[in-house]
């Protein structure tokens, strides 16, 4: 029997994502100056105010918190006083202090390979065959829709000139009994916007139009214009960017909700308080698979909440790409101060190839992949300023790329080519195939 599954995403202008990006930008700046920085940075943002707190241990770094925060906010697009949250004028308070010596003692070792996990906990990675990126389709489409909406706002402003930074999307996909996507069932797009007068009412200011036509008529015309643009500008761009097989799932009978409350002018941190780590399902698999509960942003890679979750995604993706199973969930668990994971668990949901059991796959995973924190950090080059791009539109399911970045190493500024989203690479597929005899 067919069933429906739904996932959501939020834009870089969503208040919680503003907080995530600030936390990761501060982390990046510490790592740019001192690759051994230990950082746990949390951000709170509200009307006209950002508060940054947390723990840091960095011997060779000084970060200008004020300028780092303001740069992030302005880059997102909060640069006007009308938004009631403006990177040029908002208050920025810092309450960052030194990391606990007790935690540091458990992480730092004389032999770097013996580095202990920064905390206890369990982390999950997931992969499936819904998309070319091995991600659940509802989440992938939700992310893509908002990425294209953001691109319109920043680079094709004339197409939808009223757009503001805050936005959300949600896709409901119909699946068949074999867990294959059948069609797009429902789309929800909520986007913050200026108060404007729809062209059909004439060229005038909003207040003047309200006096002439009444609030209800003006706001309905405004809403209808936004809905028309989403249907005729945004969604065609989304569909055009998809592989043919996925694009064919957009049949003419899908349900579309645009700004269902009718109006979305007040948004961003002025509309809702933003906090680091409050969008962990958006950051990962949209409700598919599982989540260990630990957020990612603002944490250096000694925190296995982040680094081990990336490693688990890498393992799951390489297992699926190698043909070990159609769908894979990997759980890793650690104890603070202990290098090796206390457990490795694999669930293939009954899709494993060649009669393989989940326990046998988990045993092989332990043999193939070195899951000590130091080795995970080394594998994915995690002691580098690569984190701010992860803080919006998903930490996983992204296209890996390299980029030259200026960093300070041994007291000198050098240009270093860094790998971004290295946990999305499929470079272990040959090794996995060989190990499983595929």
Could you describe each region identified by the protein language model?
Residues 12-31, 130-150, 299-323:
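Alpha-helical support elements that line or immediately flank enzyme active sites
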Residues 1-40, 429-432:
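N-terminal, positively charged regions that mediate nucleic acid binding
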Residues 40-59, 336-340:
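Short, charge-patterned binding micro-sites
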Residues 37-41, 167-173, 254-258, 324-335:
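A short glycine-rich, hydrophobically flanked beta-strand micro-motif that places a catalytic Asp/Glu
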Residues 46, 325-327, 334-438:
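Internal helix-turn-beta structural module
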Residues 6, 67, 74-265, 397, ...:
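Glycine-rich, mobile lid/loop segments that gate access to catalytic sites or pores
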Residues 278-280, 285-329, 340-347:
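C-terminal catalytic subdomain
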Residues 8-10, 14-19, 115-131, 265-290, ...:
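Conserved phosphate/anionic-ligand binding catalytic regions in large, soluble enzymes, centered on
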